[in-house]
Amino acid sequence: MRNFILSTDWWTDCDDAVALRMLAAAVKRGEINLLGVVVNAYLPETIPCILAFMDDCGLAGTPLAIDRDATDFKGKPKYQYPIAEMVGDKYASVPVEEPVPMMRRLITEADGPVEIIEIGFPQCLAALVEIGRASCRERV
């Protein structure tokens, strides 16, 4: 079975939500393993929003990492604010990891090669490759 990590900006458009929903459907059908999700853009509302969406997709418990140093472009995201407000503190105690250590751990623990789907900003993927070129060549 193919192993995936999704890296997404989870921002103002819908490509991220569609990609996550499609991956969740493939997981439910037993076609793939979604090892984790990385968010490479940051708003404080991102965490409860994406966790609620993942929960709704049947992906509760899937590891999540957020690049908290990523740029907050402000703006007016269509769904982050309303979803975060709707769920309140429901996800406040869910652990959120740092991107590169999580990706390295997931790649090391995987039972085969790992494919990374990159949507948005590539700084987390670039940092992973910079730190572990040899392991990336072998496993990603």
Mark where each language-model region is.
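N-terminal acidic, glycine/proline-rich low-complexity segments
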Residues: 1-139
